[in-house]
């Protein structure tokens, strides 16, 4: 049962790390990155649809994103959705595809994005700590129900802490990497 709690904890923490990776990928650095558009939802035939489901998104050059809709009629809807997003970019529509030129980031904007990355990682750490607390609560309940001894409880809690420390370190590494990426000119 203890091992099941540890395994369950690792699975939940892995999901948190994967969600953090997705969040950090969507924070724009100085280069064009198709993941910047992942959160954009386009009104397509009356229903909100993620942009990556209705168009091929590529970065043919370091500062250009190219969006080629699978259905040409979606071009104006995609352009409208990009303009309404908080990306701060102006799409250019040539009738077949949309190009976005990603402007250089100002020092001030870089610092803002770094703060966003830090907040995102802090939120992930809170989730990890909550998972640690839940695992420890389950272990304490097992000890209270005489399923494990006090020594086993202490050993299991130490293992929970080691797992948590490992994932917190991953969060810190991912954040540090993203901050370097953002601050790179």
UniProtKB/Swiss-Prot annotation:
Protein name, entry field: Ribosome-recycling factor
HAMAP family documented for this protein: RRF
Top-level taxonomic group: Bacteria
Listed GO CC annotations: cytoplasm
UniProt GO BP: translational termination
CDD domains registered for this protein in UniProt: RRF
SUPFAM superfamilies, per the entry: Ribosome recycling factor, RRF
């Amino acid at each position: 049962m203890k091992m099941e709690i540890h395994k369950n904890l690792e699975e939940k923490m892995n999901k948190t790390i994967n969600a953090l990776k997705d969040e950090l990928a969507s924070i724009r650095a100085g280069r064009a990155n198709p993941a910047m558009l992942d959160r954009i939802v386009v009104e397509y035939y009356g229903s909100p649809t993620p942009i990556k489901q209705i168009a091929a998104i590529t970065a043919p050059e370091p500062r250009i994103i190219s969006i080629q809709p699978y259905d040409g009629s979606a071009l104006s809807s995609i352009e409208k959705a990009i303009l309404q997003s908080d990306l701060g970019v102006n799409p250019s529509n040539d009738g077949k595809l949309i190009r976005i030129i990603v402007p250089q980031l100002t020092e001030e904007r870089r610092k803002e994005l770094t703060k966003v990355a830090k907040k995102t990682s802090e939120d992930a750490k809170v989730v990890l700590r909550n998972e640690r607390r839940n695992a420890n609560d389950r272990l304490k309940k097992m000890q209270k129900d005489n399923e494990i001894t006090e020594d086993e409880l202490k050993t299991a809690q130490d293992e929970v802490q080691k797992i948590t420390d490992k994932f917190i370190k991953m969060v810190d590494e991912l954040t540090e990497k993203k901050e370097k990426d953002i601050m790179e000119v």
